[in-house]
Amino acid sequence: MAYWNYNPEIAARKKKNADIFRETTKLIQAGGYITPSGKQIRFDFTRMLQQGKCFQQEIPIVSSPSVEGGTKVMVESNDCLVAAERLVKEGYNPVLLNFASAGHPGGGVETGARAQEETICRRSTLTRSIYSFDAKYASRYGYALQAGEHYPIVSEFSAVYSPAVTVFREGIDCLFMEEPYDVAVVTCAALNLNGKYPIKLTPDGHMPQAAIDITRNKIRTVFRIGLTYGHDSLVLGAFGCGAFKNPPAEIAKLFHEVMEEPEFKNKYRLITFSIIEDHNSNNRNLRAFEAEFGVAPKRAKLPAPDNITSLQPNQIFVFGSVCKV
């Protein structure tokens, strides 16, 4: 007989995460929120909905001028949303890579999962975009289904571009930000090599050639989308190196190889790999990227990944009325 190993601490954490996301959804549907100081923030979805796009076919090669001084590469132990905020404040126009679930926009955010995609969805308006590219989710949340291609995003050229995503929750406790910021997001699914799908790791734990070829095209797709829409910087990370079991050293090498291709070499002002080690990574990801790019990682002082305490009595506004959530 099989037993389910119930952990009340994990269950409580997942419930809290799910509660936070439900609140985030209410705020998105309400159109904004009230900051702790009482300032009213309104979301503007115009650009997101007008310029957002789901890609399923190979994007044509992009011809872009090289940047003066070449591309600066960083590896940092940091929250990807904090890294994106820093770049925005420094005057960059970044695009952030969201490590997607191929079949379910937002992954397990509704049930409190805590991987990178779910974290982004809890803390921003991203689901307002990606849910509108899936008929089931668009219907569930009352959003109009976007024209064109839709989920699932399973091919080597599949991705969703979401401009002007508003990040409005802090990393610690997901509290409301006094000064939210907008950032573009590319949602792309890494290849799942955890053994449950046809393409698997080799017996000695390496990526087979089929996985290498597919992943290289996924990376090219992300880079091309960024250049197509005029972005000058990328916030990347250990793509697929958690639960999907992609070897971090090989993923880092693939990123490096694509960056050196003539189409992409020195076309971005800055590329940063923002990496947080978690229960899936066994502390290998940051070291692998540091070794590949030969740079010492910038280490931010981060809270424990599970440091999510009780929600504050935040407020939302609905058509001008202030309400408690």
Language model region names:
Residues 1-234, 238-325:
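Macrodomain-like recognition of ADP-ribose-binding/processing modules
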